[in-house]
């Protein structure tokens, strides 16, 4: 009876004030669609997935996609929360997965830079290019948060977190809020005491240049040159662009990217030079097997590939050591013997470079 009585509420025009609106009146589920345009407040236990979907003419797939915490069996529906009942239909898509394979033997040559993962939970409307977050705790106020993350302003904080009102009401404990976007100055990067520039026995010691923006954990503490990752960047493309360091060096300076380079994040800064790193391409050898004088050698060849090779293959997008060896019916051990620089886990396979697939 509850379902049938609820379903006729819109016809009778007796929906209670404040039950639904453009903004939620209660907490939302973690992962709620950030593009949600209308919310329903679950004010009592009469609500079920079935009657909500019927009332708002929703498919179960859409309702669960917009409110992941509800769960497919509807066991997550709880009184006191607000659920999304209207959002752009194009947003009902599966979470994209990385092109890089989870298998160490099948890692692709060039995972591209991707956006950093979004913490959860967040309120709706959060800016999509946020690079720094703060989890609100009991007692937090906008003033306290702004003071902690100077030099951001109240206007910026509310612009990045539009679910907050101008008087900062709507700040929810346990939720994440944006406190930085690309280009936002970061006080911790410039707050190093001047005395550290002359500490120790080295009178010529200097403070290392601070990264001009967000960085990942573990970055080399003696980094002197930086690169901001943009769409389409891969580890291989950075090596080709600068030509002053090896893949092993880049991963050593930026360990968070991972050996398969799948952790390269858009708009983050990466170390591309430490003391002693050449500053021009001409300062280091080109990444080809220049020691070989074999006539008809293709170019460019995989660094370290054997000279006595009878057959070459140019690496294409999406190929892996495993797929190449299957195609040419050779063993993975023999392939790595002919192309030692691809590495143990094959992360050194370079896009559009030639690899040896047949020894003499």
Curated annotation (Swiss-Prot):
Keywords on record: Cell wall, Chitin-binding, Glycoprotein, Repeat, Secreted, Signal, Virulence
Biased composition (Low complexity): 94-113
Glycosylation sites: 129, 204
Ranges of residues in domain LysM: 37-85, 132-179, 225-272, 311-357
InterPro entries registered for this protein in UniProt: LysM1-like, LysM_dom, LysM_dom_sf
Gene Ontology molecular function, alphabetical: chitin binding
Up-regulation conditions: Expression is induced during growth on Sabouraud medium containing glucose as carbon source, but not on keratin powder, nor on human nail fragments.
Region (Disordered): 94-125
Compartments it resides in: Secreted; Secreted, Cell wall
Keyword field contains Ion transport: no
Signal peptide residues on this chain, from the entry's feature table: 1-21
SUPFAM superfamilies given in the database record: LysM domain
GO cellular component: extracellular region
Chain's role: Secreted effector that binds two substrates, chitin and N-linked oligosaccharides associated with human skin glycoproteins. Could provide the pathogen with three important functions including shielding host cell wall chitin from the human immune system, shielding the pathogen's glycoproteins from host degradation and immune surveillance, and helping facilitate pathogen adhesion to human skin.
PANTHER family, per the entry: AM15, LYSM DOMAIN-CONTAINING PROTEIN-RELATED
Comment, domains: The LysM (lysin motif) domains are small globular domains involved in binding chitin in eukaryotes. LysM2 contains 4 LysM domains.
Protein family according to the UniProt entry: Belongs to the secreted LysM effector family.
Protein name stated in the entry: Secreted LysM effector LysM2
Origin species: Trichophyton rubrum (strain ATCC MYA-4607 / CBS 118892) (Athlete's foot fungus)
Gene: LysM2
């Amino acid at each position: 009876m509850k379902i049938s009585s609820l379903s006729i509420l819109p016809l009778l025009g007796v929906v209670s004030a404040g039950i639904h609106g453009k903004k939620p009146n209660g907490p939302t589920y973690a992962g709620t669609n950030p593009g949600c345009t209308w919310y329903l407040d679950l004010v009592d236990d009469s609500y079920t997935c079935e009657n909500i979907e019927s009332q708002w003419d929703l498919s179960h797939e859409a309702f669960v996609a917009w409110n992941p915490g509800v769960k497919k069996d509807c066991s997550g529906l709880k009184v006191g929360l607000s659920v999304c009942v209207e959002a752009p239909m194009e947003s009902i898509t599966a979470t994209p997965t990385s092109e890089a394979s989870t298998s160490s033997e099948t890692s692709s040559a060039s995972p591209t830079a991707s956006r950093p993962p979004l913490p959860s939970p967040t309120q709706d409307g959060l800016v999509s290019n946020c690079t720094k977050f703060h989890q609100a705790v009991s007692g937090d106020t906008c003033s306290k948060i702004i003071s902690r993350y100077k030099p951001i302003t109240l206007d910026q904080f509310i612009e990045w977190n539009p679910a907050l009102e101008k008087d900062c009401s709507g700040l929810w404990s346990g939720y994440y809020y944006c406190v930085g976007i690309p280009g936002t100055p970061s006080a911790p990067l410039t707050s190093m005491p001047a005395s550290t520039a002359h500490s120790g026995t080295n009178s010529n010691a200097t403070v290392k240049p601070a990264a001009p923006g967000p960085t990942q954990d573990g970055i080399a503490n003696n980094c002197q040159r930086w690169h901001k990752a943009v769409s389409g960047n891969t580890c291989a493309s950075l090596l080709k662009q600068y030509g002053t360091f090896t893949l092993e060096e880049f991963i050593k300076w930026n360990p968070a990217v991972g050996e398969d380079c799948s952790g390269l994040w858009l708009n983050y800064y990466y170390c591309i030079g430490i003391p002693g790193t050449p500053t021009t391409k001409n300062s280091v050898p080109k990444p080809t097997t220049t020691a070989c004088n074999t006539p008809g050698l293709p170019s460019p060849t995989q660094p370290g590939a054997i000279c006595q090779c009878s057959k070459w293959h140019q690496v294409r997008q999406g190929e892996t050591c495993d797929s190449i060896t299957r195609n040419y019916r050779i063993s993975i051990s023999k392939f790595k013997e002919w192309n030692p620089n691809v590495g143990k886990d094959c992360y050194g396979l370079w896009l559009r470079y030639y690899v040896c697939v047949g020894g003499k």
